[in-house]
Every structure is written in C-alpha cells, then in structure tokens.
Amino acid sequence: MTSEGSKFGNINSQPSCNRELQSMASALPGDEETPLVGDISGLEGRKSHHTRDVHILSLAFLLVFLAFGAAQNLQSTLNTEDDLGTTSLGILYLSFTFFSVVASLVVRVLGSKNALLIGTTGYVLYVAANLKPNWYTLVPASVYLGFCASIIWVGEGTYLTSAARSHSTDNNLHEGAVIGDFNGEFWAVYALHQFIGNLITFALLSDNQQEGSTKGTTLLFIVFLFIMTFGAILMCFLRKRGANSKGQQELSGADAGACASLKSLSKSLASALSDVKMLLIIPLIAYSGLQQAFVWAEFTKYVVTPAIGISGVGSSMAAYGAFDGICSLLAGRLTSGLTSITTIVSVGLFAQAVVLVLLLLNFSISSGFLGTVYILFLAGLLGIGDGVLMTQLNALIGILFKHDTEGAFAQLKIWQCATIAIVFFFAPLISFKAVLVIMLALLCFSFCIFLLLALKVGKAPSPSTSQRN
C-alpha cells in the first residue's frame, strides 16, 4: 500500500506497535492513501480532519454563492432590456447541462479539489460581467460559467461523499447517517447564501424601487467580488481526496488514455440511464431544478416585485434562504436511510404544493404589512421545499450509487440544469398560470414515481462500510 501519511503527520513504523492498530490502519478506505502503522494521535487526527474539510467546503461555498445567488435573483428584474437577464441565465443552464455530460470525466482527471478551485473562476467572472451587463459580457460569461458550474458541483458531491465515507469508517459509524449529517451541514450553510446575499442586496438597493434601474448595483457587485475572492482562497485549504473505488483509481491513473476514459464515460452515462433506481429518481431531480428556476425567474418577477417592489426581492429571498438553511440542517440530521428520506421529501413537497395552490387560486392579502408578511410566508415555504430536496437528493445519490459517485452526481446536474434552462427559455413565452400548472403536475408525478422507488428498494439498510469492516 502506498503511504501518504506525511500529509496528516508523519507516522513511523514501530516493532512494538499494537497489531490491532495496524489492522485498523490498513482497513481505511481507498479514497485516501494511508500509512500501514499509526499511533493514537495520528489516528485521532485522521478521524477529525474529515469534519474540518466539510466546515471549510461549506463556508467557501457560502461566500462564493451568496454573491452569485443574489446576482441571479436580480437578473429577471434588473437586466430587462431584450430579456438579457433571463436569456443569459437560460444560456448558463443550457451550457451547464451540456458540460455536465463530461463533468465526471473532468473531475476524475483534475481531482475533486482542483475541480472546486477552477469552478470558482466562472462565478467570479459572471459577477464581474454584471458590472457592465450587455450581450458581449454576460453571454460569454454565462457559457464559461456553465462549464465551471458543472465541475464544481460534481466535485462538491464527490468530495463530500468521500469525506463522509472515510469518516464513517474511521469512527465505525453508520455510513448513511454520516452522509446525511455531512449533507445536512453543507446544505444548511450553503442555503444561508440566499439569506446573507439578499440582505446585502436589500441594504444596498433599499432606495431602488424601479424595475430595470441600475442605481447602486455597481457597489453591490464590487462588494460581491471581494467576498467571492475570500471564498476561493478558503478552498485552497481543503485536503486533496482521490477516487472512491478501485475502478475510479484505475481511470484516473497515468496509464489511462483519453480514448479509454471517454469509453468509460460513455459506459458510465449509459449504465446510469439503464439503472432503474436512477430512472425513478430523475423526475424528482427534474422537479428540483424546475422549482429553483421558478423562484429565481418567476416568483421574484410576478409575485414579489408587483407586491413589494424590487427592493423586496432581497428581503423575500432572505426569508427563502433562512428557511432553506434551517430545513437543510434538520433534514440532514434526521436522514438515516431511504425510509427517512421518503418521509422528509413528502413534507418538503407538501410545503411547495401549498404555495402553488395558493398562487393558482390567486389568493392574496391587501398591500401593507400583512401583504409583505404573506409574500415572506410564501418564500419561506418555497425555501423549506428546496432545503429538503437538495439535502435528500444528494444523500440519496450518495447512498444508492456509491460505486460511481461522479457519474451519479453528473446525472443529478444534467437533469436539474436541463429543466432550469427550459424554464428560462420558455417561461417568457407562456403565462404565469401555465407555469404553475406545469409545476404542480410535475410535483405530483415525481412524488408518485419516488414512492415507487421507495417500494422497490424497500427497507433494505444503507450499505455501511463500517459495519462490513
């Protein structure tokens, strides 16, 4: 076995070392090469650095995405000339969809940490393009961000799942529960980007009530660029992680040629689409993308802005982010396997169904304080649904597809982004009520198919590496 112990503290072989420690060291998972022999302090260090990496990853994503999330929320109300804002977002997610097809291969070649670092550059460039928004700045930035987003999200899912599996093995914990905990922490912190980013937006644009006005946006985007830079720097402190399985190690080895890699990628994508479990998850993945695009493009434009003005976008999305974060944390803590995931997803979908029905019935409260509270209430329910879906889908994929983690997370992003792109391109062509009907229909369909998955898999326990060892 190769030794990489120097990364975590040098641990020398000693003749008197306890044989049980040798056995424990050799049983550690393949995503991190480990020394054959270790002392107690070295072993304890290995047990703790996985959680440290999750803390760093979560905070870095918060800093990067609080800027991008706020900029994205403003596109449909700020860059309104020739629908530049929504069109650029449509191009972004179309690019995201196409690049997600090869994202798993890119992440395997680069490694998950390098993919995360390169991925941040696209978000910085996109926010910078908003300093002078036009077709020649936003469109190229959107295309490049599509590539960067595809690798940063596949890298994130791979990195987080690898850390969870290693942590469960090192501490002899249930793997499914650890994956749920790690995803809960990440998505809870990540969801705060909506809360913090939109509070900053509200503070800097509080005097800006007119749709299409650019007053104060230059300062806003400059502040965001500084914050994103700190997030990118923070990612440099992540520890490198390798492949999760023997097959992935072989693919990323130096002797793996380009043709072999592409062939493996094609087989991986075809295998995922022929897997009944993945086919049963795809409708729910598609709905998760649809509901995100609805919040960014439709809810802010047709519900929030007419009721409380463009400055209300910041406060309503802050409420959305707050509930998103709280529910992500709670959902992650409660996740232990498919049964708990099914229950939690049911609650999240019900919350969003309530919003869709209220909007379809055109239920509203008179303007003023109660009107504002009603908008914040709707935003909070949407945040609950998003927090549940993001946490549970990532945990579910980590549990069910442990032998091809990159490929499974690539499928997640392909289907999410395809539906998001469709919304940004076609929503302007159909009425708001038609969008609501489509969303409600897909919600019901995806939930029924997801219940079929739960029945198919049954109550089979999540594989736990720790239990096998």
Give each language-model segment a name.
Residues 68-72, 198, 270, 276-318, ...:
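Extracytoplasmic gate region of multi-pass secondary transporters
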Residues 89, 95-99, 145-157, 161, ...:
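Glycine-rich segments within core transmembrane alpha-helices of 12-TM secondary carriers
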Residues 121-135, 347-368, 424:
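C-terminal ends and interior cores of transmembrane alpha-helices
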Residues 98-114, 205-207, 324-346, 427-429:
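Helix-to-loop junctions at the C-terminal end of transmembrane segments
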Residues 217-237, 350, 435-455:
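Symmetry-related core transmembrane helices of the 12-TM Major Facilitator Superfamily/SLC fold
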Residues 20, 30-49, 246-279:
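Juxtamembrane intracellular "pre-TM" segments in multi-pass secondary transporters
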Residues 58-62, 137-155, 159, 282, ...:
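Hydrophobic core of transmembrane alpha-helices in multi-pass small-molecule transporters
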Residues 70-74, 151-170, 295-299, 303, ...:
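Intracellular juxtamembrane helix-capping segments at the cytosolic ends
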